[in-house]
UniProtKB/Swiss-Prot annotation:
PROSITE patterns: COX2, COX2_CUA, COX2_TM. This is Cytochrome c oxidase subunit 2. GO terms for cellular component: mitochondrial inner membrane. InterPro entries: CcO_II (IPR045187), CcO_II-like_C (IPR002429), CcO_II_C (IPR034210), Copper_CuA (IPR001505), Cupredoxin (IPR008972), Cyt_c_oxidase_su2 (IPR014222), Cyt_c_oxidase_su2_TM_dom (IPR011759), Cyt_c_oxidase_su2_TM_sf (IPR036257). PANTHER family: CYTOCHROME C OXIDASE SUBUNIT 2 (PTHR22888:SF9), CYTOCHROME C OXIDASE, SUBUNIT II (PTHR22888). The gene is COX2. It comes from the Eukaryota. The keyword Transport applies. It is found in: Mitochondrion inner membrane. GO terms for molecular function: copper ion binding; cytochrome-c oxidase activity. Component of the cytochrome c oxidase, the last enzyme in the mitochondrial electron transport chain which drives oxidative phosphorylation. The respiratory chain contains 3 multisubunit complexes succinate dehydrogenase (complex II, CII), ubiquinol-cytochrome c oxidoreductase (cytochrome b-c1 complex, complex III, CIII) and cytochrome c oxidase (complex IV, CIV), that cooperate to transfer electrons derived from NADH and succinate to molecular oxygen, creating an electrochemical gradient over the inner membrane that drives transmembrane transport and the ATP synthase. Binds a dinuclear copper A center per subunit.
Length: 251
């Protein structure tokens, strides 16, 4: 019981990674994810209003007709109520649709990114290419990222989430992720960054991220891609610009 309460408490104060008994989104680190959270909360508010009204109507109808089973014979055609129950749902849908479309187009826009990272999905690992940077050998910086097996996990590392190499990016920098697949369809998804994009073989999809705080953010392949689908984690380390430049010099 104590472990359960501790886990629930940690979910409230810190939720950058998937946790047991988690019932809400991970903490957002990008404007896109902030918009997604706000849209979700607004829609849930409207849903509770609708649930309350419908429940009240059902309760009233059951209460009324249980006392007088013949009352329905005295009900006549009511144009006013028909207009109300047609217009009210339409207004609610419009209130939900407009912010949703705006957010959808904002998340899809990638304008003048400061750097580009290419993520290629394989069965069953990820390969990353920093196409804007070249090492001392004149080659593009690239590496592969594999899940750490259970028997090699160290204390504090997360099962099926930690990887042998991390994607290191600077904070407060407009980053473009170009995503594709090498064999079957994969999906590049990082909840805290508001990123979820298909990795289709033969096609390049792109998504942008502006990470606003330092930290380690985890994701996974979100498209069933074979027997080891669960062994395709994604680990993003967001660091300050000086630390990022230091990391680049080490590559």
């Amino acid at each position: 019981m104590l472990n359960l309460l501790n886990t629930l408490f940690l979910n409230v104060i810190s939720n950058d990674v998937p946790t047991p008994y988690g019932i809400y989104f991970q903490d957002s680190a990008t404007p896109n994810q902030e918009g997604i959270l706000e849209l979700h909360d607004n829609i849930m508010f409207y849903l509770f209003i609708i649930l309350g009204l419908v429940s009240w109507m059902l309760f009233t109808i059951v209460k009324t007709y249980s006392k007088n089973p013949m009352a329905y014979k005295y009900i006549k055609h009511g144009q006013t109520i028909e207009i109300i129950w047609t217009m009210f749902p339409a207004v609610i849908l419009l209130i939900i649709a407009f912010p949703s479309f705006i957010l959808l187009y904002l998340c899809d826009e990638v304008i003048s990114p400061a750097m580009t990272i290419k993520a290629i999905g394989y069965q069953w690992y990820w390969k990353y290419e920093y196409s804007d940077f070249i090492n001392d050998n004149g080659e593009t910086i690239e590496f592969e990222s594999y899940v750490i097996p259970d028997d090699l996990l160290e204390e504090g590392q997360l099962r099926l989430l930690d990887t042998d190499t991390s994607v290191v990016v600077p904070v407060d920098t407009h980053i473009r992720f170009v995503v594709t697949g090498a064999d079957v369809i994969h999906d590049f998804a990082i909840p805290s960054l508001g990123i979820k994009v298909d990795a289709n073989p033969g096609r390049l999809n792109q998504v942008s991220a502006l990470i606003q705080r330092e930290g380690v953010f985890y994701g996974q392949c979100s498209e069933l891609c074979g027997v080891n689908h669960a062994a395709m984690p994604i680990k993003i380390e967001a660091v300050s610009l000086p630390k990022f430049l230091e990391w680049l010099n080490e590559q």
